[in-house]
Structures are given as C-alpha cells and as structure tokens.
Amino acid sequence: MSGTSESELKNLISSLHLNNGFLGIFDCRFPGFLQKSKIQTAIINTGPREQGGIHWITLALEPISYKLFIFDPLGWKDTQLIKFYNFSLNSLIKRSALNNSDRCITVERNTQSVQCTCAGSCGLFCIFFLYCFHFYKQNVFKSWLFQKLNGSTPSLIPCEPHLLHENQTFLYDFLNAKSVYFRKNYRTFIENTKTGLIKTH
C-alpha cells in the first residue's frame, strides 16, 4: 500500500488531539460544511472510497472570521483537480450550506505545492495543516509553523524537488516529535509515503 489509510489518518488526529470540530474522513462525495456557526474540519479524498481513493486534501472552517481554508499539498488549481482527478472544489463549496448565507465567506487556499509528486505523503501533510489550524485558526497559512514549509510552483514534474523533499523530512521529524502513534508506526509511514515512491522526476 502507498499513502495513508483512513484508519491511519484517524489515529493521527486522535494522537495529536485534533478532534475538536473534526467531522471525519470523506471521499469525493463529501457534502460540505453544514453548520456554519461552528469550527469544522475534514480530510477529503478526491476519489471514491470503493476505488481506494486517489489524493488527500483538507478543509477547515473558521466561523468567527467566516473563512474557509482549503489545503491541497500539491497546490493544484480547480482546473487541474478536475483534469487529474475529476474532482471540483468549487462544486463542493456550492453543495455546502456556506453558499446560502447572509454573510460572504472568504475562501483561502494555498497556491503552491509543499509535497513532491514523487511521494505518497498527501495525507500526512493534511494532518500537519490541521495541526497548524488548531493553533492558528484565523491565519493558518501565514502562521510561523506553516511557513516552515517551502513552497514551489505546482507541476507534475516539480521544478524544485529538493525543496519539497526538505518539506518531507521536516514533516517526518515534526510528526515523530508530536505523535506517539506516528513514532510507533514510523517505519510503516516512511515506507508508504517516502519520496521516490512514484517516478515523476
């Protein structure tokens, strides 16, 4: 198996005490956030569950500033998500009750990749994002912790793979320091998510 499973992601969430507002793990049919007055987070796969999934992304709703944060470790635009995975974030937002409100929601998303396309670590990066959101809810992307990651132009063949590989090393070190569950399953996580797992460069 490559990547991280639903059960592994749930165990990491619990290990890092990120359960507050966490709705769970979903596939591409995620209905959206339906309670706009509460903090809510979710990890979503761009593929259907019955086919094993494809790529993990994560969403987080901050109700005070009414911001929806969308984090894709590969930094794909909506057009690229549709092209590569037949998955649309815009459609997901429109399905949500957030679209039917007297307040305008602000959508913030990353425009750079932090994960190399040669790795299977999207799920782990989603966990890291939710950790950042837990402590820096209103400005997660600008938080000092998230800014530890190098950003690169999204591409199937990365132009700066060494920077993205540095992110992977940082990610492993971070999770190893913070999560007992990650430490106990360190070898499995590394083997299933390491750089060079997929031949892209």
UniProtKB/Swiss-Prot annotation:
Whether Protein transport counts among this entry's keywords is no
**Which GO cellular component terms, listed alphabetically, does the Swiss-Prot or TrEMBL entry include?**
host cell nucleus; virion component
Domain of life where this protein originates: Viruses
Q: Where in the cell is it found?
A: Virion; Host nucleus
Q: How is its activity regulated?
A: Requires DNA and protease cofactor for maximal activation. Inside nascent virions, becomes partially activated by binding to the viral DNA, allowing it to cleave the cofactor that binds to the protease and fully activates it. Actin, like the viral protease cofactor, seems to act as a cofactor in the cleavage of cytokeratin 18 and of actin itself.
Catalytic site: H55, D72, C122
Protein family (similarity comment): Belongs to the peptidase C5 family.
Its name, as the record gives it, is Protease
